[in-house]
Amino acid sequence: MENLTNISIELNQQFNTKEEAIRFCGEKLVEAGCVEPAYIEAMIERDQLLSVYMGNFIAIPHGTEEAKKLVKKSGICVVQVPEGVNFGTEEDEKIATVLFGIAGVGEEHLQLVQQIALYCSDMDNVVQLADALSKEEITENLAIA
């Protein structure tokens, strides 16, 4: 996977709601200097417009089109959630065990989403990320993508 110079990896996280999970991803992007704090609200708004759940136990929280002006540099936050977090409803659960919070300058945003979606379309890759015991293991798995 290309363009992973600004990457934050968080292992063994737990969230009660998808909003809490999205905010966590956004905060990591802010801490990395990738986005302005207002980008976090745009990530919540984006999920309300169209779910950021992608299937295969993966969610890709990211901001709205209008929030691109809040992106300082491209970055990604990989968050492992062993117990999962529901991005669906009680009736139609959509459990994510790996989150990819992303911010992309210009068209890099779309490229990041496409790269992650392609990589995670293989369940073996998702399992490796979900079961990784170290940040280095996740970095290695993503580097070969």
UniProtKB/Swiss-Prot annotation:
Its main location: cytoplasm. GO terms for biological process: phosphoenolpyruvate-dependent sugar phosphotransferase system. The keyword Kinase applies. It comes from the Bacteria. It is found in: Cytoplasm. GO terms for cellular component: cytoplasm; plasma membrane. GO terms for molecular function: kinase activity; protein-phosphocysteine-sugar phosphotransferase activity. Keywords: Cytoplasm, Kinase, Phosphoprotein, Phosphotransferase system, Sugar transport, Transferase, Transport. It holds the Pfam family PTS_EIIA_2. CDD domains: PTS_IIA_fru (cd00211). PROSITE patterns: PTS_EIIA_TYPE_2, PTS_EIIA_TYPE_2_HIS. The modification Phosphohistidine is found at residue 62. The keyword Kinase applies. The active site is at 62 (tele-phosphohistidine intermediate). Residues 2-145 form the PTS EIIA type-2 domain. The phosphoenolpyruvate-dependent sugar phosphotransferase system (sugar PTS), a major carbohydrate active transport system, catalyzes the phosphorylation of incoming sugar substrates concomitantly with their translocation across the cell membrane. The enzyme II CmtAB PTS system is involved in D-mannitol transport. The PTS EIIA type-2 domain is phosphorylated by phospho-HPr on a histidyl residue. Then, it transfers the phosphoryl group to the PTS EIIB type-2 domain. This is Mannitol-specific phosphotransferase enzyme IIA component. It comes from Enterococcus faecalis (strain ATCC 700802 / V583). The lineage of its organism: Bacteria, Bacillati, Bacillota, Bacilli, Lactobacillales.
